[in-house]
């Protein structure tokens, strides 16, 4: 369907949990989070009802996120049920891949088509520091397994932070020359824990691109969040997601469902609607989703204000 600004909204990002098996420095506090009561989070049946209703309004792309979606039991069943909705054409997942190696075959059989893997360092000790305990070898094995079963293109999402991992930019770029792997560099955002790092850690996409004159621009869809480039010898592309220096609101095609059941029309807006109040009434649910999508804000103002208006942390919304 179209929002009131004429944008086609066909993409729903679903955070199935706010819990995670890592504690990335820009996402979660070091002590972790307080576990929510079961009644305060969306059950699979409720998530499926929202996905089904959204599909009736023109949503045909679903991405499951977290927290970390793979820590939830039976996530493959939710993917399978979603894949049986005829109008859903693409099901993807964003994961830290710690648990992916042993699950990726079943996930693919269930209907998962693509994975984005959050990976902010290729160095074992640094990865452990950024994630506060993660084992990078599990991620590497998951990538190898995913490639071996034809789960591609695989995209790696990398949040670049000055003084923390910006010396690895070339190493990440070179992955696209060796493997059928896309890399997405994401600007650090002043949201949640990222606020603490933003002043000293922010690097613009433009600064990175300007230092690599051999990058070749690649044509992108209007709704893409990334500006795409590649090297002459690249197997896949290199993307730059630039919410701070070059926002992509004019072509935004997505809304977000949080693990608590709130529908956020914009990642950086404080406006959201609690759909848990409507999942027992199909018509009311459909109407509320329709209303929320239609009233999606024209744009965020994070560039001007240097801070997200969202009151939620990234692990609650889904990155």
From Swiss-Prot:
One of its GO terms (biological process) is Mo-molybdopterin cofactor biosynthetic process. GO terms for molecular function: 4 iron, 4 sulfur cluster binding; cyclic pyranopterin monophosphate synthase activity; GTP 3',8'-cyclase activity; GTP binding; metal ion binding; S-adenosyl-L-methionine binding. Binds 2 [4Fe-4S] clusters. Binds 1 [4Fe-4S] cluster coordinated with 3 cysteines and an exchangeable S-adenosyl-L-methionine and 1 [4Fe-4S] cluster coordinated with 3 cysteines and the GTP-derived substrate. Pathway: Cofactor biosynthesis; molybdopterin biosynthesis. Its EC number is 4.1.99.22. [4Fe-4S] cluster 1 binds at residues 20, 24, 27. [4Fe-4S] cluster 2 binds at residues 249, 252, 266. Residues 4-227 form the Radical SAM core domain. Belongs to the radical SAM superfamily. MoaA family. Monomer and homodimer. This is GTP 3',8-cyclase. It comes from Clostridium botulinum (strain Hall / ATCC 3502 / NCTC 13319 / Type A).
């Amino acid at each position: 369907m179209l929002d009131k600004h004429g944008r086609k909204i066909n993409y729903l990002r679903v955070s199935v949990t706010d819990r995670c098996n890592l504690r990335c420095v820009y996402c979660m506090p070091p002590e972790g989070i307080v576990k929510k009561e079961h009644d305060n989070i969306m059950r699979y049946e409720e998530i499926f009802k929202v996905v089904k209703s959204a599909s009736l309004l023109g949503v045909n792309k679903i991405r499951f996120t977290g927290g970390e979606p793979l820590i939830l039991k039976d996530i493959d069943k939710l993917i399978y049920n979603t894949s049986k909705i005829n109008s859903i054409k693409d099901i993807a997942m964003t994961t830290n891949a710690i648990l992916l190696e042993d699950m990726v075959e079943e996930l693919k059989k269930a209907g998962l088509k693509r994975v984005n893997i959050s990976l902010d360092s290729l160095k074992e000790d640094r990865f452990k520091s950024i994630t506060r305990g993660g084992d990078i070898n599990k991620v590497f094995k998951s990538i190898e397994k995913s490639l071996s079963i034809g789960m591609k293109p695989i995209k790696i999402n990398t949040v670049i932070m000055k003084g923390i991992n910006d010396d690895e930019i070339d190493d990440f770029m070179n992955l696209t020359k060796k493997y059928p792997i896309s890399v997405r560099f994401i600007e650090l955002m002043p949201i949640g824990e990222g606020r603490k790092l933003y002043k000293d850690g922010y690097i613009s996409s433009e600064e990175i691109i300007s230092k690599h004159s051999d990058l070749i621009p690649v044509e992108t869809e209007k709704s893409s969040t990334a500006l795409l480039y590649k090297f002459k010898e690249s197997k896949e592309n290199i993307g730059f997601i630039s919410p701070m220096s070059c926002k992509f609101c004019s072509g935004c095609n997505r809304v977000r469902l949080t693990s608590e059941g709130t529908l956020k029309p914009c990642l950086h807006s404080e406006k959201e609607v609690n759909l848990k109040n409507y999942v027992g009434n199909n018509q009311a649910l459909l109407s509320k989703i329709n209303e929320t999508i239609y009233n999606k804000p024209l744009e965020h103002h994070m560039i001007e204000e240097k801070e997200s208006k969202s009151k939620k942390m990234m692990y609650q919304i889904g990155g």
